[in-house]
């Protein structure tokens, strides 16, 4: 049996495939939650890049674990509060959970860490590509996938810049 598509159906199929091939990747559902205890997290370092100021926060337990040479505990949040021109623009949240690495294939694994972007109102920023976060943070495997992890042992109560 021969299947024949009408010219309109063929055009729709080709247009649809072309559109999807160029469709931008968006945030994906994952296990990351916005920390309910944001006000209890410790601001341990600040990074400044032009008009962007990034405040990094985490739990006292995570700081103590790193200082003791132990792994960051499961359940830990690391939060980057991204300020642009002095105003909160968005949050980047890394969260660690037991077995979370199994959610991704080997090319995307970052230990048991998952990543999510949030708007200032704490809703998920669906315009961000969390695969990009995983890709960059994979280079930091030796420091729990944290770019600022090396600053934690030096933290003594005042944010390090």
Regions found by a protein language model. Give the residues of each.
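A generic membrane alpha-helix/interface feature
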Residues: 1, 20-21, 155
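Bacterial N-terminal signal peptides that target proteins for export
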Residues: 1-12
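Short, structured coil/loop segments at alpha-helix boundaries
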Residues: 2, 59-60, 160
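Intrinsically disordered and other compositionally biased segments
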Residues: 6-7, 18, 118
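Bacterial N-terminal signal peptides
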Residues: 10-21
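Sec/Tat signal peptide C-region and signal peptidase I cleavage site
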Residues: 23-27
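Sequence context surrounding c-type heme c attachment/ligation sites in exported
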Residues: 28-51, 66-161
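Short, structured beta-strand/loop micro-motifs enriched in basic residues and often containing a Trp
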Residues: 53-63
